[in-house]
Amino acid sequence: MADEVCGPYLTNSTSTNAGWHTFSSVFIWKRAQILVAELWAAFYPASPSEPHPLFPAGAAIHQLTMFADYRVPQILHHLNIITYPPSLLKILRGQVMLETGCREELSIRSASIVAVERVRLAMLRLATEADEDDKREGEDGTRISSVLIDFYLWDLAKRVENGEESITGIATVPIEPVHRTRSIWY
């Protein structure tokens, strides 16, 4: 179902969020995915037994990745889930504007997508080990999804950056500035 909603949007879009990395195209469809995820979340039924009013057959939300923005990579780095080379840390700390689609920007965003997918898979494995009932993703694949992980991490990053919350119990690195780029895709 996510493909059915995103498809017309992507087909009718006049431009794409694409870049080149090692001789191949990289497409990041953040806006299309957010469209589906926000519609799904905004109209989510009060009871899980009720069908979704916009996606009665299921939104296939589990097919979406995280949204590859600037905030989630920041918290993933803080949590030691992704690491940055010293050269990139220097760029971030200097608040240097990255060119849209450059190697650094694509690397940060792509690493975040991969990292959140790995977090999702680890969560599914832990749920399976903990309790047979928890291993299910849900009837519509939404119990443990990259979309919900993205929502949580984005909010967590803001709270940590603003000093409203701190991470305890695990080793973290100092929270770094977000990467900066001028783009309509964020």
Region locations from a protein language model:
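HhH-family (HhH-GPD) DNA N-glycosylase catalytic core used in base-excision repair
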Residues: M1-Y186
